């Protein structure tokens, strides 16, 4: 992908005339200008006089018609497009107006930059939801892909990926109990902070004094959730320990939290109990035995890469040898559902290095492999280095995983997209049949309530009508305590 960025520090102005349809327009701009900041102007129909680049989007009502006009100045080029449609209003026809502006802006930016995003116009984080309405209506794969391509201009490879993912999910979602809920526990501590990470987490070195008090409050929160689950006669379907790195706790501390879960919830209907062991250097036989004793049946051992030089660059204080040791330790402890996370596009990594990582992971034969595309979030140290990271060969790495993993019996079972993902790529979980993570599927499908406990956890309440209410806990451990 060519370098299309100019002055990265100067905001890119976007002018809205006759409407205020900002959200989707900004999303389209970010596809082509992923780390630029934007200035949004509403009280003018023109770019500022000193602007060397920017976009103008105008909506005018002309009798029985609406005039849509888009002009883009970028990379020394100026392109514009004008279209007329039957009269529509941004107040009463918001989605339609957004779609028309998005399509026009997308085509102009595509022509100027010579970039052809594989996901086309699709900006949402849950592509599988675009497929699901067709599955119950008897549409074939070819028919579904044709319809989505016509509307969103998605590439054949991505269409096949999202369709195959939806097909794997369908029977698992059909088995979800009507009164089922998932329980998420946040353990926001890590041995060290990775340079790419923007999650609210604290290194053990800095925050070890906070842990006892934090766990005490977490267990108190579990008592409250447990009471609510009993009163409402709900069924705990899945439990997921995330973070952070849950195994940065000691075995005794893990037992404290696991006991609180066991004492406050009926786990007899549980379909999945997952703990993100995460960092290989935090995994010990004692911790694995503790997890196994409390019924945990799925864990993650997350190397992110099997290149020692890259691990050092991103601030992960473990080696590939420790990853192999931790994985074998988990197998010896009796875990038969182990996931391994990889990240495509890490600083210092190359297509050759990623290929070598894939080969080493496949040799270990985990039960599932999740491939993330590096996301430049504003809270991460890497964001400041965004200019050099925006156009690295992430797409090539992701495509290799899409090809190699199915060859070894792994099928895509869940996926999601994020803003500021390098090369506009996606995160995909691949699994052997029967080893899919139910929690991962459910959180993306948004069809089941999730009760979040701990710092930074989010609760998602899904009503029978489909309406979703989100409740966010405090992000910082000190505030939570």
Task: List each language-model region with its residue ranges.
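Short Lys/Arg-enriched alpha/beta "domain-start" segment
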Residues: 10-50
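Short, well-ordered secondary-structure micro-motifs within conserved domains or adaptor modules
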Residues: 36-80, 85-90
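N-terminal [4Fe-4S]-dependent radical SAM core
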Residues: 113-116, 136-183, 232
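Canonical Radical SAM [4Fe-4S] cluster-binding loop centered on the CxxxCxxC motif
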Residues: 179-215
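Conserved non-cysteine loop/helix-boundary elements of the Radical SAM core domain that shape
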Residues: 201-401
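Flexible glycine/acidic-rich beta-alpha junction loops that bind and position SAM and/or redox cofactors
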Residues: 309, 313-314, 344-351, 366-391, ...
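Conserved small/polar residues in nucleotide/adenosyl-binding loops
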Residues: 479-481
């Amino acid at each position: 992908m060519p370098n299309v960025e100019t002055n990265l520090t100067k905001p890119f102005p976007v002018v809205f005339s006759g409407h205020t349809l900002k959200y989707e327009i900004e999303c389209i701009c970010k596809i082509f200008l992923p780390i630029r900041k934007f200035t949004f102007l509403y009280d003018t129909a023109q770019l500022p006089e000193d602007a060397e680049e920017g976009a103008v989007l105008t909506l005018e009502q002309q009798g029985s018609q609406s005039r849509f006009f888009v002009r883009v100045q970028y990379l020394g080029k100026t392109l514009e497009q004008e279209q007329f449609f039957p009269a529509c209003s941004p107040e009463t026809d918001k989605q339609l107006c957004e779609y028309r502006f998005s399509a026009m802006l997308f085509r102009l930016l595509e022509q100027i930059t010579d970039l052809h995003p594989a996901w086309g116009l699709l900006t949402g984080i849950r592509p599988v939801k675009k497929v699901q309405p067709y599955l119950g209506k008897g549409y074939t794969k070819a028919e579904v892909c044709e319809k989505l391509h016509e509307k969103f201009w998605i590439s054949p490879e991505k269409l096949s990926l999202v369709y195959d993912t939806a097909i794997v999910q369908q029977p698992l979602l059909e088995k979800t109990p009507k009164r089922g809920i998932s329980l998420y526990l946040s353990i926001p501590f890590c041995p060290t902070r990775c340079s790419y990470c923007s999650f609210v987490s604290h290194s053990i070195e800095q925050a070890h004094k906070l842990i006892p008090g934090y766990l005490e409050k977490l267990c108190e929160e579990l008592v409250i959730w447990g009471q609510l689950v009993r009163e409402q006669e709900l069924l705990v379907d899945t439990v997921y320990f995330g973070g952070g790195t849950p195994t940065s706790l000691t075995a005794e501390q893990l037992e404290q939290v696991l006991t609180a879960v066991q004492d406050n919830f009926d786990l007899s209907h549980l379909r999945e109990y997952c703990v993100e062991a995460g960092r290989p250097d935090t995994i010990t036989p004692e911790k694995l035995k503790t997890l196994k004793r409390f019924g945990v049946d799925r864990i993650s051992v997350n190397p992110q890469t099997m290149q020692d030089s890259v691990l050092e660059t991103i601030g992960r204080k473990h080696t590939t040898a420790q990853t192999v040791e931790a994985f074998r330790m988990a197998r010896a402890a009796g875990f038969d559902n182990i996931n391994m996370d990889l990240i495509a596009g890490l600083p210092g990594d190359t297509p050759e290095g990623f290929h070598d990582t894939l080969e080493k992971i496949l040799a270990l034969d985990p039960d599932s492999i999740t491939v993330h595309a590096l996301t430049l979030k504003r809270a991460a140290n890497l964001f400041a280095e965004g200019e050099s990271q925006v156009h690295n060969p992430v797409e090539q790495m992701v495509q290799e995983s899409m090809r190699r993993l199915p060859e070894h019996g792994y099928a895509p079972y869940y996926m999601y997209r994020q803003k500021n993902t390098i090369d506009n790529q996606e995160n995909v979980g691949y699994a052997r049949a029967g080893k899919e993570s139910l929690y991962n599927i459910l959180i993306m499908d948004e069809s089941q309530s999730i009760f979040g406990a701990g710092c930074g956890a989010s609760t998602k309440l899904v009503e029978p009508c489909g309406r979703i209410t989100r409740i966010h806990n405090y992000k910082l451990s000190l505030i939570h305590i």
